[in-house]
A protein has these predicted regions:
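Pyridoxal 5′-phosphate
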Residues: 1-163
Length: 163
């Protein structure tokens, strides 16, 4: 009995000048083209995780994370944000005197992908007293060499901003 929340192909049974008849559920809620590629990719992702093993993935991410944190924390201009025991495989940080969006831009030029911004937690950033943070999210595909590149990228940021 709920009306559809969006329009698109496959969700309409009949259209007349004065009325529209929607397809029966669930089709009236599945407008547009089905995300076939995403469904296939999801299946393959699950196969990959199952083959590799969650413990192996967790241990690898932790090793890379600890290596990266050790390198980054040695830099006096960098503040690492967050509780070390609850961080997961994420490094959120700021560099004194450089806006996180500038950090992200410079790192991007070096081929390093991070995010910068509030990360959907503006209140936390208000509490921290920072307009935003830079965030490196690690996964099974990251290596210690990636952390070396991140550390070198941070040094480049400092050089560009003469810090």
């Amino acid at each position: 009995q709920f009306p559809p929340y969006q329009g698109g192909g496959g969700m309409i049974e009949e259209v007349k000048k004065e009325t529209i008849t929607f397809a029966p559920s669930p089709n009236k809620f599945e407008a547009g083209t089905m995300q076939t590629a995403e469904v296939v990719a999801f299946k393959e992702s699950l196969n990959f995780i199952e083959k590799l093993g969650v413990d192996k993935i967790y241990n690898h991410e932790n090793q890379v994370l600890e290596y990266g944190l050790d390198k980054i924390k040695k830099n006096n201009s960098v503040t690492v944000i967050g509780n070390p025991k609850e961080r997961g495989s994420i490094i959120s940080f700021t560099i004194k005197g450089i806006h996180p969006h500038d950090i992200a831009t410079i790192l991007d030029e070096e081929g390093i992908a991070i995010r910068a911004g509030h990360h959907c937690c503006q209140i936390y950033h208000e509490i921290l007293g920072t307009p935003a943070t830079a965030r490196a999210s690690l996964g099974i595909y990251n290596t210690k060499e990636d952390m070396d590149a991140l550390s070198a990228g941070i040094e480049k940021c400092k050089k560009v901003f003469k810090i």
